[in-house]
Structure formats: C-alpha cells, structure tokens
C-alpha cells in the first residue's frame, strides 16, 4: 500500500486517472432514482485521493477545462444565435431574466449569511448545477488584488460549497419542476391535458400521425404478393400510395417483382398487377398486417436484398430551414423517406407535424439508400459516421476565444475580463454556429464531443478535488448543514419564480413553461422528470433555446459573482 501511495505522489497523473475511474463508477450507481452523478462523485473521490498529500502541477487542469467549455459552446452555438431571431426572442428573454434570478438569489443569500467570495461562488455553482463556475470563478479570483494565501483559501472552499449544495441542486430541481411545477400551473392533470392538446395541435395526435415515429418505432420493409381485386387490370404505384395516404398510412412501394423480373427503380407510373410481389416501406405498425388487404406476405430474400440507410443530416438549406415537419414531409424528394428523430443542441425534440425544423438541427432520415441520399442533399449536409475530429477548428477556436477572453478593462482599479475560460466558451458558441452554416469543415463527431465535454469537465474536477483534499474536511466543518439549507433555497426560489414568470408574464403554453424553466437552468435531469410526470415529450420544445442561453450566462456568472462579493 505504501508503494502505491508513493507512486501516486511521484506520478500524480495516475492519481487523476484513479479519481476518474472510481468517480465514474460511483456516479453510475443508483439507489432507487437517486444518484450522486458523475461530477459530484469525481469531486468527492478527488477529495479522498487528495488526503494522500498529492500535488498536481502544470496546466493540465486549465487545458481540459478549456476543452470542456469549447465543447459546451460548440454544442449550443446554433441555438444560441437562433434565439436572436424574432420567433426565439421571447424564450431568449425569459432565459436571460431567469438567469439573473439564478445569480441574484445566491448572491443575496451569500450576503445575508456573511459568506466569503469562495463560498458564494461554490453556492452558485452547486445550487444552479453549473460546474463550470468552479473554474471561471477560480480564474477571476486569481486576478484579484489579494494575497496568494487568501486566493488559495477562496479557491479551496469553492469545491466544498459546491459539493454541499450540488446534491439538492440536482435532485431538488427535478422535484421542484417535476412535482411542484405542475401544481403551480393548476395541477398535474391539467398540465397533462395541455400537453396532449399541444400534441394534437402540432401533429393531429402524434400517435396516429402517419410517417412520424419515436426511435423505438423503426421503419421496416416487407414483401407481399398482390391478390386483392382492387388492383383489377392494374393500378399505378402512385394510385396505391395515394390509397394508403387516404387511409392515414404513409407507405411506399420500394421494389417490385413482375413476371419473375425484379424492378429496382419503381416509378410512380409503374403498373402493378395481381400476382406481382411488392416491397412496402414505412412505419412498422402500418406495414405489418397488409397481408389482410394486398395479399399474403412472402419471404423473398432476393427481393428484399437492398441497402436501407439511417442517416443523420444537418439541416442547412434555406429552403427547408424554418419549415414545419409536415411541409418538409410533403416535398417530392421525401418520397420513401421517414424522419425518425430530430436533435437540437444535443436534445431530442418531438417529431410532430407542426414541429419547426431549424438550421443546425440534426434530422435522422430512414429509407432506402438512394432515396435517403437524395433527400439528404436537399435538406443539408449528410453527417456520415467518421472517427476524425477537425482539430484545426478546435485549436483555432480555443485560441481565438482565449485571446479575446484575456482582454481586460479596468473599473475602479479592478481588472475585469471574461478570462480565457469565458473566452473559450464564446469561441465555442461562434464556431459551433459557424459550423451549422458551413458544415463541410469543423466536424466534431458525437463521441469525440462527449469526450471533450465529459472527460474535459471531470478531468478538471478531479484536479480541483485533489488540490482541495487537504483542506476539505476543515472547510466542510466551517460551512456545515446551514449551507445545505441555503443551497436548497438558492435552488428552489429561482425555479419557482421562473415557472410563475413563464406562466403569468410571458404567458407560455403550459406544456412549454416547465421545459423553458428547466432549459434556462440547464438541468437535463429535471427535463426528464418533467417529461415523465406529464407523460409527454412536448416540454422539450421549450428547452433548447433557453438551454443555450442558460449555459452561456450561468457560466459567465462565475465572473460576476466574484466581482459582486
């Protein structure tokens, strides 16, 4: 054991990976619905490892923190700038005011309790579950004209305050918005009804809307032998597909075997006759059962041997950006193609007829390869799987953003700047938006973005925990249980105020009120709790724009809280 401890002291990089290993493992453990979460677990494990008196030198903490902030900005950039448009301004304005609440309430409570700068920053970071504040506030503290000992004391107490307040910040947010929120809107049953009403308004009832599906409802391809007298002496392919449409079934004829010959490219005017074998594509629940009408299903491996494709496409074409799903679906190039999923700022949004598709959205198409490829060209840029990240783009974005963040102005003799960390966030916002406009460069595959986001943050948190380890226990004794109660207030008050503001001032639809509030507080856990409570995905429609604004402002508040104290 002594040998292992010695090696961890000599090679502190191993201590970091020990912290990540144990932290991620504990963070995945759930007791009922409760989980510490990865970030808190990594921090606490880092504190334990730090008891071994391990010193981590060098810029490793800052490097990974900058990668994390750039990834955050890159992910939400398109939605942040989209919010500046007229239709996004109400949600953007709501998010900005909500974020002010999230700053002012912790600041007032910190002043009342007599907290120092580090305790206030930790309170903000934990109660609002915005881990990046730890780094941004720390950078700002390091620029203050105070003694090195005081700087160290402030920086060491931040993770203590964060750890104490983060647990309620996460679990409490989910409870406030998932349980208390619907009551503030008139009761859970009323909110459920409002969500169903919005679904019906946007998609004529999603469950019955042909051609739309959740990811669990895949497109399928089945072959049938025509036996129905409806075909008479022959019906064109367009006649059959129109018949399906009239019966609320968005099905397509993909292939035909006629007189023993397979027709791979079926035109709308192709005539189908009794005895022909046809391949139909569409939602599984509509395709299965057609033997009751067309004729018996046939197992024909040769007829069914053709490439089908699931392809994510980034929407960039001005002709479709801003259009409703129903409008896009009706376009000629969407023949044979279904929309399986829409992701916006990394969040799944409901695929409903009236859902508006924005530039930068990732739309997942399903169908035969040639039809999907044709549709992809008309929608935007096919985001085909790749293992390559454009590191030129990443490096340049962080460099330019960091240089901008390093610029400072002096107010009352105090240098004020975004810091390199805030600059990296701004760089990510701009470069993420730029990539949505010009998707041929700047690609960061989703797994790589996950690494930058999660590993970047947790590597930073691990080093913070290890550094704070020796003073953590004493710091915890100083802040005590009272900080937990203060943190609960700092979490709950802005959320309750946000729900009431969204309802009475901004007059958002009840289905969007909770989603907008969760987004402004960037609490994905609460969004899941809301959707589970109201039994609908519609709250996600209010989440994305407010999430982009919240993720930006709440991180910048790490600078502001230090200056206010």
Swiss-Prot record:
TM ranges: 14-34, 36-56, 92-112, 117-137, 157-177, 391-411, 414-434, 448-468, 481-501, 508-530, 545-565
Subcellular localization, as worded in the UniProt entry: Cell membrane
GO BP, sorted A to Z: potassium ion transport
GO molecular function, one term: monoatomic cation transmembrane transporter activity
InterPro entries: AAE_transporter, Asp_Ala_antiprt, RCK_C, RCK_C_sf, YidE_YbjL
Name listed for the protein in its UniProt record: Uncharacterized transporter BF638R_1531
Tree of life domain: Bacteria
Keyword Cytoplasm: no
Native species: Bacteroides fragilis (strain 638R)
Key words of the record: Cell membrane, Membrane, Transmembrane, Transmembrane helix, Transport
Cellular component aspect of the GO annotation: plasma membrane
Pfam families reported for this sequence: Asp-Al_Ex
Lipid bilayer topology: Multi-pass membrane protein
RCK C-terminal domain location: 296-381
Residue ranges the record marks as coiled coil: none
Protein family: Belongs to the AAE transporter (TC 2.A.81) family.
UniProt KW Lipid biosynthesis keyword: no
Chief localisation class: membrane
